[in-house]
């Protein structure tokens, strides 16, 4: 009798939520399978999606740990700001999702990889104009960058604590 599947709890989870959590779970499962500790970055990832306070639930069979009653609000540590559509000849083509600037600390989350920092030097908007600000949801933009990322990689902005 082994584990045959995992379920991500909740309804209507976003692409950002699903990508972040499944990437972290995959890294954790692979580590456990190989007899290694779960990587710290994978544990940290589940806190980077919008979530309510985590608890152990029924895991330790304690009556007082089954639910968390102090606050039912959501916690969010990162904003989902864009999707990488393609990378060709050093050019990264993106679709902007939420406001960001080239001065923001950004990260890229790609399937099966540890998230990496992204320092965007400038942006070219859909009118062909150079800008430092992405403030039109779903606008197609691009920038030149020495590293290539797979299509559908996610760009996020960690929020100040």
Residue ranges, per PLM feature:
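Surface-exposed amphipathic alpha-helical tracts and adjacent flexible/coil segments at the periphery
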Residues: 1-161
